[in-house]
Swiss-Prot record:
Superkingdom, taxonomy of origin: Bacteria
GO process annotations (BP): cytoplasmic translation
UniProt gene name: rplB
Sequence intervals crossing the membrane: none
Biased composition (Basic residues): 253-273
Subunit structure: Part of the 50S ribosomal subunit. Forms a bridge to the 30S subunit in the 70S ribosome.
One annotated GO molecular function: transferase activity
One protein family per Pfam: Ribosomal_L2_C
Name this protein carries in UniProt: Large ribosomal subunit protein uL2
Length: 273
């Protein structure tokens, strides 16, 4: 893994910082694990914009990643590491002993040729997936399920991890990267180690066009709009004249948006703000 700062041969290259990983496979992805990825431009079936700042971008295929890791007792070998345009983490193509291939999230330290396994009897080793009741307290994990069998939902981005703080009864207590401490059923699965490609946060796109390649359109400030377009628009000078709100009038700062009271009992400590 190398961090490359581009030479200022043009204004668009002056601030570019790239992450170069020589271990990534340079060929095409495994075709059987690809799916089409349609673009909506942020519009619904009526053609109206429902999500702003979306449109354009390079054509991509979706990589079908195995978040359940449910092939218990069947050893697998890592064939190669690959780039995935749909997520910040890299992915690994693994070959199981029965001949099946699957993509998984590539943990930090995993490389081609490594052996991995899943199931209650799997060893405590980077890349192995186990129910959290079988993982020692204090371990660092990623790709954590919130419901048994549903598949990983937590700690899937580049460089993220979760620490197991305690195990009590049918639940384990986890500390998330946000600082939140919450309880999850001990039968939920997690993968040992942290997600790789942690240097992703150090990259710099360098120009607005790089965001357009990613399908992200410009964001205009509400204060720069007219009154018809945004509550912050218009007026003399640079003054909102009101509490910051969204284009539809919902308070933007300090307004509680969490609605799921049913799961409040599982949150031991709210995230750091």
């Amino acid at each position: 893994m190398a961090i490359v700062k581009c030479k200022p041969t043009s204004p668009g290259r002056r601030h570019v910082v790239k992450i170069v990983n020589q271990d990534l496979y340079k060929g095409k992805p495994f075709a059987a694990l690809l799916d089409k990825k349609d673009k909506s431009g942020g519009r619904n079936n009526n053609g109206r914009i429902t999500t702003r700042h979306i449109g354009g971008g390079h054509k991509q295929h979706y990589r079908i990643v195995d978040f359940k890791r449910d092939k218990d007792g069947i050893p697998a070998k890592v064939e190669r590491l690959e780039y995935d345009p749909n997520r910040t983490a890299n992915i690994a193509l693994v070959l199981y002993a029965d001949g099946e291939r699957r993509y998984i999230l590539a943990p930090k330290g995993l490389k081609a040729g490594d052996a991995i396994a899943s199931g209650a009897d799997a060893a405590i080793k980077v890349g192995n997936t186990l129910p959290m009741r079988n993982i020692p307290v204090g371990s660092t994990v990623h790709a954590v399920e919130m419901k048994p069998g549903k598949g990983a939902q937590l700690a899937r981005s580049a460089g993220t991890f979760i620490q197991i703080l305690a195990r009590e009864g049918n639940y384990v207590t986890l500390r998330l990267r946000s600082g939140e401490v919450r309880k999850v059923l001990a039968e939920c699965r997690a993968t040992i180690g942290e997600v790789g490609n942690s240097e992703h946060m150090l990259r710099q796109l360098g120009k607005a066009g790089a965001n357009r390649w990613r399908g992200i359109r410009p964001t205009v400030r509400g204060m720069a709009m007219n009154p018809v377009d945004h509550p912050h628009g218009g007026g003399e000078g640079r003054n909102k004249g009101m509490q910051p709100v969204s284009p539809w009038g919902q308070k933007a700062k300090g307004f509680k948006t969490r609605k799921n009271k049913r799961t409040d009992k599982y949150i031991v400590r709210r995230r750091n703000k």
